[in-house]
Amino acid sequence: MSVYKYKAFKSGSKVSRLIIFLHGYNSCIEDVEPFAEMLLQHLDNTLVVMPEADTQSERNPLKKQWYALVDVDPDRKRRKPETPTDEIVEIYNRTGPRISETAKKMNAFISSLQKELKIKNKDTYVMGFSQGAMLAMYVGLTRKYELGGVFPFAGIVCGKDMLEKEHWVSKIVNFKNRKG
């Protein structure tokens, strides 16, 4: 049984590429479904899987979140234009243990799909919007083997202290210094 409830959208007759698309904070699968349809218009033999977070949103009981934010930013400073960037980064850094645990679950979910579909890491991509983008980046940085790509929309790398503790920061440096 899957760790997450999800919807899957397919193009072509044989799946040779897997895209995991992660919704944002205070969102759900239905909010991002149109993106799957747009992607599949341009990609053959692709399966787009949209898992839904398993935690109810703190802001809206009808929506979901990948991990809690209210207690690390009760005043919602991260949303205020006057908040300095370094303070916003620190707010998201405090989510490290939560995003780390969520990334472990997501990595297990992705690995189980890859095994079931016989899809390799190089043919697996993770996309996300907002909190889903942050999770996508963390997943990409913490997988044992490199993915085909990570495509974040409107997110930052968060949980820096946790990445350092888990020894993943060198992966970021190596990625930034890659040629080609």
Annotated model-derived regions:
Residues M127-G132, A136:
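Gly/Ala-rich beta-loop-alpha elbow adjacent to hydrolase catalytic centers
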Residues E33-P34, L62, V139-G140, L163-K165:
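Short amphipathic alpha-helical segments
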Residues I20-L22, M127, R178-G180:
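Short hydrophobic segments within beta-strands
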Residues Y138-G149:
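Conserved hydrolase catalytic core segment
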Residues K7-K10, P152-G180:
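The feature captures the conserved acid-bearing segment of alpha/beta-hydrolase catalytic domains
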Residues S2-I119, D123:
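Serine-hydrolase catalytic machinery in alpha/beta-hydrolase-like enzymes
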